[in-house]
Amino acid sequence: MKQKTILKEVSLKGPGLHFGQETCLTIKPASPDTGYIFKRVDLEGKPEIPAIADLVSDTSRGTTISKYKASVSTIEHLLAATYSLGLDNILFEIDGPEVPILDGSSKYFVEAFHKAGIKEQDAELKVYEINENLSFVDEERDIEISTFPDKSYKLKVLLDYKSEILSNQYAFLNNLKDFTKGVAPCRTFVFLSELEPLLHLNLIKGGDLDNAIVIVDKESTQEEFDRLAKLFNKPSVAVQSSGVLNNLKLQFTNEPARHKLLDVIGDLALTGFRFNGSVVARRPGHFGNTEMAKLIRQHILNQKNQPSPDNIPVYTQNSKPLMDSQKIKEILPNRYPFLFVDKIMSLTKTEVIGVKNVSNDEYYFSGHYPNNPVMPVALQLEAILQTAKLFLLSSNGSDKNTYEFPQISNIVFKRQVVPGDVLIIKVSQVDPVNGFIRLKGEAFVGTELVAEADIDAKKIK
């Protein structure tokens, strides 16, 4: 499966729901592995904000992401359309603080993407599997969102409000291909009891009675309806038999639940990844949705950081080494107490596997730490670097040159290494970078990755 973007740029204009500012949104293609990026073209420097859950800054009446002093609000309807249409790399250029609300749904965003056209890119798409149950519960807000392992992407939303209309309503989606007809046209909604306070707080400047369903959840007088009509610049408003204010006709009997499902899709797009899993959300809102997005994102990042079983080196004590310590000393200049490779188990043109036995009588344990011995992380890294140098020197046969490491990056230590552990060190050669030899160094204890680093090597005379 390939990554996707759009064929050509497309633009939409309109006011934002909460600020009421007229904005222009221009949607552009982006290169593979870009993800979703918002660009505030109205601000100095045109700052970019990646659409990821880590950058969520507010969820009071929509989802806002921020980076430094730049932010973009009410992004969920746009992202729901983007994600559901299978688009992976998009640049959103916007000249204001909020995405246009349009009709309060994803309908016009879907139409814009179809107008722009969709194309496959020359890059594989990785779809991650949720392999354990994830749950977010907020007892104060009475929210519960769970994600379970599944072979596909599925969602179910349950609404349970103190309202006759929304006391028990649900919606589900088992295939994103059904989003365009069954979910995208569903408009946002608000309770009548919330409406006037929001208006007085200036939190709904761009809303009118054409882009939001108003659920009548309280007894109201004609005087109150007349006041609302004046606030929205309408001749009059009335309660329909469906319990909805104004003349909007519900497109589905469960349109509010379907819209909540739309919001969940948009907010979960902030994971930054495609994934398979079954999401069940009871009384979802932007806060709970984005908290679940953070959980899923971290779950996937943890998967990415774990090496594939095929890439974990296998070592047994009875395995015959390719090089013993004596042979290693013929290649490396290091000597006790600063030689941290005991054996070389295998060596190819692209990879070496070395071993360091961490014994109880290592000299550094007397001070690091008494009664709680731990191998210093600097020495774990040194063991990786010595294995890397041995790989480079051995790969060049009679070449008398040596090597230095001008840059070591992305160093991660994942757990302590203690007496009795056997450090299995794997160093692999990857593509050259800026004229340097790029190596990937990893250290394992058993099948567990305990340390890793990217190493740039340079030949010297």
PLM features: what roles do these ranges have?
Residues 1-88, 93-312:
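C-terminal regulatory domains involved in ligand/effector binding and gene-expression control
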Residues 5-9, 322-328, 423-424:
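Short Pro/Gly-enriched beta-strand edge/turn motifs at strand-loop
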Residues 89, 278, 342-346, 410:
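Extracellular/lumenal ectodomain signal focusing on beta-strand-rich modules
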Residues 171-189, 375, 443-451, 455-461:
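Flexible glycine-rich active-site/ligand-binding loops centered on an Asp-His dyad
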Residues 435-440:
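Short aromatic-glycine-enriched beta-strand elements
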